[in-house]
């Protein structure tokens, strides 16, 4: 299991300062919408300057019509990121075209499909998708696998079911990881790192428990022990 550190702080300088503290550790730097829109592609180069061994996870959750989405993914791949997210709700045709475009490259990022955001409660998910959360997450994941993507973003509570249905080689990335599960904030389906490993998660995403800590590096070292 690998650790992705979410860089969601208010200022670019704060994100870079956090990474300076974590230099030399085996982790992924997750760049989301806020940081990428504010700081641009140059931010990715600044991450690499701090530690060239940090892998970069560009979490943009692409969602559009097929060719627009494929072209956007191609531009992201040109930035030499190591992982990229797309929405599974964009449907099989969009994902298939996207993967055809990326597979033509000598090197491409891992493509992870977002099934259900961890901010969804079961009730909210039913209202939007008219299906039970776990059932729909597996259905979307199966469609993603047929399209050729590498894995899915899901909560810890769907990870094991996805693996059982689609095989252990189909990757799962699980956000909503907390040190204290009572600290949900805007997430509904949270778990800790040990539970993520028990449920065969390949990647975990941790943000606020790290950068709200007095000693972020110590928190990361503890998380890495659980990985």
UniProtKB/Swiss-Prot annotation:
InterPro entries attached to this UniProt entry: Aldolase_TIM (IPR013785), OMPdecase (IPR014732), OMPdecase_AS (IPR018089), OMPdecase_bac (IPR047596), OMPdeCOase_dom (IPR001754), RibuloseP-bd_barrel (IPR011060)
Catalytically driven reaction(s): orotidine 5'-phosphate + H(+) = UMP + CO2
EC primary class: lyase
A Pfam family hit: OMPdecase
GO cellular component: cytosol
Superkingdom as given in the UniProt entry: Bacteria
Annotated metabolic or biological route of this protein: Pyrimidine metabolism; UMP biosynthesis via de novo pathway; UMP from orotate: step 2/2
GO MF: orotidine-5'-phosphate decarboxylase activity
Keyword Lyase: yes
Active site: 61 (proton donor)
UniProt keyword DNA-binding, yes or no: no
One Gene Ontology term from the biological process aspect of the record: 'de novo' UMP biosynthetic process
EC number(s) on file: 4.1.1.23
List of residues binding substrate: 8, 30, 59-68, 118, 178, 187, 207-208
Matches recorded under PROSITE patterns: OMPDECASE (PS00156)
NCBIfam families membership: PRK00230.1 (NF001273), pyrF (TIGR01740)
HAMAP family, sorted: OMPdecase_type1_B (MF_01200_B)
Biological role stated in the UniProt entry: Catalyzes the decarboxylation of orotidine 5'-monophosphate (OMP) to uridine 5'-monophosphate (UMP).
Family to which this protein belongs: Belongs to the OMP decarboxylase family. Type 1 subfamily.
Subunit organization: Homodimer.
Protein's name according to its UniProt entry: Orotidine 5'-phosphate decarboxylase
């Amino acid at each position: 299991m690998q650790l992705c550190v979410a860089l969601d702080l208010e200022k670019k300088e704060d994100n870079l300062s956090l990474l300076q503290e974590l230099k030399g550790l085996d982790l992924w730097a997750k760049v989301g919408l806020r940081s990428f829109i504010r700081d641009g592609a140059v931010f990715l180069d600044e991450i690499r300057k701090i530690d060239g061994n940090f892998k970069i996870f560009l979490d943009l959750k692409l969602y559009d019509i097929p060719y627009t989405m494929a072209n956007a993914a191609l531009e992201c791949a040109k930035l030499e990121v190591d992982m990229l997210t797309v929405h599974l709700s964009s449907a099989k045709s969009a994902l298939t075209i996207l993967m055809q475009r990326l597979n033509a490259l000598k090197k491409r990022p891992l493509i992870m499909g977002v099934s259900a955001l961890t901010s969804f409660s079961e009730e909210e998910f039913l209202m939007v998708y008219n299906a039970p959360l776990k059932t729909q997450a597996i259905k979307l994941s199966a469609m993603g696998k047929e399209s050729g993507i590498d894995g899915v973003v899901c909560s810890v509570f769907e990870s094991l079911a996805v693996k059982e249905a689609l095989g252990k080689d189909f990757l799962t990335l699980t956000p909503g990881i907390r040190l204290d599960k009572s600290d949900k904030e805007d997430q509904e389906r949270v778990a800790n790192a040990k539970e993520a490993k028990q449920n065969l998660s390949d990647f975990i995403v941790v943000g606020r428990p790290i950068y709200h800590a007095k000693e972020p590096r110590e928190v990361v070292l503890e998380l890495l022990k659980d990985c």
